[in-house]
């Protein structure tokens, strides 16, 4: 039940860097809507990171796309990543425990966190499904 290899052990002992995805779906602020969708789809995570000059500018989630379509209808097709993204996405350090990442995602009602290193560089994404 409390075996380190079990789900509780994984949650308590595992670090974010051990579970993060490192093949990241990345777009730029001026990427058009259709290309954003393609990048999100190819990444298979339901998100795209908006990066410029190696800096994280925002994140686009499936929810952001749905809200944009609901609010703007067909005009959404003319939007860019900068207009769709959530600025200042939630981040977590790669050496934090996975349990902390899961707790943060539950608290913020989000499904993914951007993972950063000591230099604040983006190094991955970690997902949580409830």
Which residues fall in each region the model found?
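Bateman (tandem CBS) regulatory domains
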Residues: 12-24, 78-89
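A glycine-centered beta-loop-beta connector
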Residues: 40-43, 48-64, 105, 113-129
